[in-house]
Amino acid sequence: MLANSASVRILIKGGKVVNDDCTHEADVYIENGIIQQVGRELMIPGGAKVIDATGKLVIPGGIDTSTHFHQTFMNATCVDDFYHGTKAALVGGTTMIIGHVLPDKETSLVEAYEKCRALADPKVCCDYALHVGITWWAPKVKAEMETLVREKGVNSFQMFMTYKDLYMLRDSELYQVFHACRDFGAIPRVHAENGELVAEGAKEALDLGITGPEGIEISHPEELEAEATHRVITIANRTHCPIYLVNVSSISAGDVIAAAKMQGKVVLAETTNAHATLTGLHYYHQDWSHAAAYVTVPPLRLDTNTSTYLMSLLANDTLNIVASDHRPFTTKQKAMGKEDFTKIPHGVSGVQDRMSVVWERGVVGGKMDENRFVAVTSSNAAKILNLYPRKGRIIPGADADVVVWDPEATKTISASTQVQGGDFNLYENMRCHGVPLVTISRGRVVYENGVFMCAEGTGKFCPLRSFPDIVYKKLVQREKTLKVRGVDRTPYLGDVAVVVNPGKKEMGTPLADTPTRPVTRHGGMRDLHESSFSLSGSQIDDHVPKRASARILAPPGGRSSGIW
């Protein structure tokens, strides 16, 4: 808790409180960083700051489940550190972010986590937590996973089926990681693409002389995402472990997820605001820097129906969450791949624009109502991360992470006015309805009417508890009722075949009535004197009884009888 948060009292008056399951008119009173009262005609002490929310919505602060602040990736470091990244989040209406720790192969997960904490703690402006990447597998990794879950407040691990020779895990390794996640009550997050075929596709594209950003789209077709999605759901199901798919980008992958949920498999899924609102046509732009700015993986899809389809999947709960996957690079950094698209750093911005873009395309576009908007931008994340209802809901006792949202106000997005890093904005000149007027983080007003007022380091790390109910409750019950058992039967007491010279292919002993063929000499000649042929006319099968011969009187085709 902030040192002076106890002295901060806020009354949000006259607005409509929106949770994921209901909307109602109510005032909200905040004190000591906690929502104290929600209702009408509240009895509150004097000295409270009053915020007029008449005609506005009062919603839970957004939770962005995928950000990459201060991360080095593909030889480039993201332009946003934890201060500038969380500042942009708050300006956009997001009050909590989840960052990523990606250890190099053969390095310690715990050490990488501690290094990231040391970078983040003095910088963050809002609450945060961390996913930890599993980029290699060994017994030591499992032991460190347990340490992170039991002692460090981590309840999710990120894996990749792509990025061959960098982060990619084999199916057998995923199987082992899922077993560990199930045992520790953690959530396995997987980026699903067929890494082997992606690598081959990239080689083929380069061999054809394709070096520009369009090579990303060509070498990452959606069928490779769909195949990997089906495969990893199967692996998770075999280990009785939940699975969380990230960066879902295609209609095909969405259909695989929908089918798995219909079958009762515990599958959670997340897309990004970029995939749910943009298309891959940008990769074919004549301006190389424009095309490169959109390079992310999986790529944006050429099918113009994809983004609206993904938004529909968010609306019907096939997809649970929309994240930003914020990892911006400058044009200069992207230019490291100007002669080879495989060297363009993968990453786009979006932490500041996520809430407004989803409101515009989701709510204004008629795909979802304000309750579902709250679900996909905040409440579902809180439930999955085991933070609900402390976060993701406006009720007494919850953390005072609150946004006063104006559904009628508009803004035009531009790189020239953005707070987030980078010299490009994917949504340049996009006009959005839905604007955060006031952002309250941990009980303090940090953004109001265009003015940011929060110092770095005022955020806090939020430890995440294992075994979240929304993820594990069904699986725990299934383990009790569907436990695999062996069959209780009478032991077999008969003879058992003995294997001679194991490892060598043994020829079986021929039966008595099986003709044997003499050994062929070198050069292909047979010893005729060793043949089974006999001048007496006797044959090897003469002892087998023969049927009596019968003369067939009918002509070919059968006997016919005349009419006359």
Swiss-Prot record:
<keyword id="KW-0963">Cytoplasm</keyword>
<keyword id="KW-0597">Phosphoprotein</keyword>
<dbReference type="InterPro" id="IPR011778">
    <property type="entry name" value="Hydantoinase/dihydroPyrase"/>
</dbReference>
<dbReference type="GO" id="GO:0050774">
    <property type="term" value="P:negative regulation of dendrite morphogenesis"/>
</dbReference>
<feature type="modified residue" description="Phosphothreonine">
    <location>
        <position position="514"/>
    </location>
</feature>
<dbReference type="GO" id="GO:0043025">
    <property type="term" value="C:neuronal cell body"/>
</dbReference>
<feature type="modified residue" description="Phosphothreonine">
    <location>
        <position position="509"/>
    </location>
</feature>
<dbReference type="InterPro" id="IPR006680">
    <property type="entry name" value="Amidohydro-rel"/>
</dbReference>
<dbReference type="GO" id="GO:0005737">
    <property type="term" value="C:cytoplasm"/>
</dbReference>
<dbReference type="GO" id="GO:0045202">
    <property type="term" value="C:synapse"/>
</dbReference>
<protein>
    <recommendedName>
        <fullName>Dihydropyrimidinase-related protein 5</fullName>
    </recommendedName>
</protein>
<comment type="similarity">
    <text>Belongs to the metallo-dependent hydrolases superfamily. Hydantoinase/dihydropyrimidinase family.</text>
</comment>
<feature type="modified residue" description="Phosphoserine">
    <location>
        <position position="538"/>
    </location>
</feature>
<dbReference type="GO" id="GO:0098978">
    <property type="term" value="C:glutamatergic synapse"/>
</dbReference>
<keyword id="KW-0488">Methylation</keyword>
<comment type="subunit">
    <text>Homotetramer, and heterotetramer with other DPYS-like proteins. Interacts with DPYSL2, DPYSL3 and DPYSL4. Interacts with MAP2 and TUBB3.</text>
</comment>
<dbReference type="InterPro" id="IPR032466">
    <property type="entry name" value="Metal_Hydrolase"/>
</dbReference>
<dbReference type="InterPro" id="IPR050378">
    <property type="entry name" value="Metallo-dep_Hydrolases_sf"/>
</dbReference>
<dbReference type="GO" id="GO:0030182">
    <property type="term" value="P:neuron differentiation"/>
</dbReference>
<dbReference type="Pfam" id="PF01979">
    <property type="entry name" value="Amidohydro_1"/>
</dbReference>
<comment type="function">
    <text>Involved in the negative regulation of dendrite outgrowth.</text>
</comment>
<feature type="modified residue" description="Phosphoserine">
    <location>
        <position position="532"/>
    </location>
</feature>
<feature type="modified residue" description="Omega-N-methylarginine">
    <location>
        <position position="559"/>
    </location>
</feature>
<dbReference type="GO" id="GO:0016812">
    <property type="term" value="F:hydrolase activity, acting on carbon-nitrogen (but not peptide) bonds, in cyclic amides"/>
</dbReference>
<dbReference type="GO" id="GO:0030425">
    <property type="term" value="C:dendrite"/>
</dbReference>
<dbReference type="GO" id="GO:0032991">
    <property type="term" value="C:protein-containing complex"/>
</dbReference>
<dbReference type="InterPro" id="IPR011059">
    <property type="entry name" value="Metal-dep_hydrolase_composite"/>
</dbReference>
<dbReference type="GO" id="GO:0005829">
    <property type="term" value="C:cytosol"/>
</dbReference>
